[in-house]
Every structure is written in C-alpha cells, then in structure tokens.
C-alpha cells in the first residue's frame, strides 16, 4: 500500500520534469515586418576599415511583392553602401547594391531559397582600400567588382533595408538566420573555405585551447558574433565576442520573429 501511495507522487514529479525542460532554438525565422539594428560600423571597429560580414542563412516562403533584403548598410546621407536582396520570383538569384549602384541579378548554381533546410554561408569582404569580394559558401560570386567601400557612418541593419532614423524601412526579409559574424579584417579565402565546410557555431571559448591558453590568430579580429540561440523570446541579441555590440529586434504591429530549431547548435 505504501508503494501505491507513492506512485502518484512519482508520476507527478516525472511530469513536472517533462514540462520544465527547455528547448534551445538555433535560429530566427523572419516573416516580414521585422528587423535587427546594430551599431554604426565606425563604433564597432577596432582599428582598420577592413571588414568581413558573414551570415549563415536559409530561405523561406515569401509573402510580399518586394525583394527581401538580408541586410543593409545605409549611411547618414541615406546612400546604400551595401545590401543584398533575394529576388522574390527566383529561387537561385540575388541582387546586390554597392555604393547605391544596383548590380544585375546574379544566378547562382546550388542556391535554392525555396528550401528552408539548406543553410548557406554568405560572406562579404569590404574596405576603403581594396575591392569588395562576396562568397556563397566557398565560391566567389562577385570576385572582380572594382568597388571600394567606406561604411564608417553606416548602421548595420539585418532583415530589411533601413536607415538610421527609419525614414527608409522596406524590403523585409523572409527566411532563417542562424548566425551572424563581423570581423575587423578581410578573411583569407582559405579561411572562408574552411568555415563553409564546418557549419557548427563557434563555441563560447573559441579563442582558447583545451588548456585555457589564448589563441592569437585571426580570431582576435572577431568584433561581433551573434549565435541566435535562444531559450525564450528576447528583444536583445547579445554579442558573444566580448565587445558588447548587441543588436535589438524591432517589429511592426502585427508581425513577429519566430524562434526556430533549424540550423546549427
């Protein structure tokens, strides 16, 4: 009889365990009407004007007549320094704007925005002293563009085409963003190739060996890493690089950003 009396209590405790288990989400799912604001580029840099901006990203269903923007850098004069758009009617095409010039659409073999489970590493290497380079995974998709870019007073916006005072606010993103990285250097092609083959997110102690010794490599130039791993909805995206370049999520009325288990842990 004692065992029978304890059994309901044990079952109740077991149920509580199941209910309180937390799900760790790996990415954010944008469905229009939402964006993330980061700091002005000049305030985030350490020394040089050399940058590499990277996204692990996948597509999703589009419900708009506009071309969704993955990100934008718009300066204080409302000039688009750099932006990438996915073309609504094409699953393998992107359009890039550099220094307010819209380049012809680029068709890319192997790109499929209609597949929400296929994540791509998109890398932008830019500075005011060298021409811009853009990669999809380890393949250059804009290797010879003669454009130098001074993004100093531009604010990094992810998920839309936005200027700092939001008088421009359009082309909202549709799709998944798994991780964002910002480096204060132009990464080597070999580094980007290595990263594209290893989609796992950088761990908390990526700058250290197993023995706790600091690794002095290109990793020291990582000035922003936003892993987008959440256990609950938050409006602030913390920067795990140690430089406190946090981002803030904004949404229009009637819109939201969803937490998703898609992507790397």
Where are these regions (language model features)?
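Extracellular/lumenal carbohydrate-interaction signature centered on repeated Trp-anchored short motifs
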Residues: 41-53, 110-120, 148-151, 169-176, ...
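Extracellular glycan-interaction patches encoded by glycine-rich segments
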Residues: 152-178, 187, 209-213
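Sec-dependent N-terminal signal peptides
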Residues: 3-14
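Extracellular glycan-interaction surfaces
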Residues: 16-32, 54-63, 83-148, 182, ...
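Short structured motifs
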Residues: 36-41, 102-109, 163-165
């Amino acid at each position: 009889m004692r065992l029978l009396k304890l059994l309901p209590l044990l079952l109740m405790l077991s149920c509580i365990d199941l209910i309180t288990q937390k799900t760790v989400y790996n990415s954010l799912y944008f469905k229009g009407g939402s964006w993330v604001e980061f700091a002005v580029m000049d305030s985030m840099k350490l020394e040089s004007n050399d940058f590499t901006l990277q996204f692990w990203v996948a597509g999703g269903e589009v419900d708009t007549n506009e071309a969704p923007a993955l990100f934008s850098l718009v300066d204080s004069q409302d000039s688009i320094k750099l932006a990438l758009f996915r073309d609504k009617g094409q699953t393998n095409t992107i359009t890039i704007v550099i220094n307010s010039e819209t380049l012809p659409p680029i068709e890319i073999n192997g790109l499929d925005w209609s597949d929400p489970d296929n994540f791509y590493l998109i890398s932008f290497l830019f500075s005011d002293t060298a021409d811009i380079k853009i990669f999809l995974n380890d393949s250059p998709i804009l290797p010879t563009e003669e454009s130098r870019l001074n993004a100093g007073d531009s604010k990094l916006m992810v998920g839309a085409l936005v200027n700092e005072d939001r008088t421009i606010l359009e082309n909202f993103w549709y799709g998944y963003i798994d991780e964002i990285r910002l480096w204060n250097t132009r990464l080597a092609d070999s580094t980007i190739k290595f990263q594209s083959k290893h989609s796992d997110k950088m761990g908390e102690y990526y700058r250290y060996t197993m023995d706790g010794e600091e690794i002095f490599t290109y990793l020291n130039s990582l000035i922003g890493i936003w892993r987008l791993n959440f256990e609950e909805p938050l409006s602030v995206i913390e920067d795990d690089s140690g430089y406190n370049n946090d981002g803030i999520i904004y949404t229009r009325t009637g819109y939201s950003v969803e937490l998703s288990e898609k992507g790397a842990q």
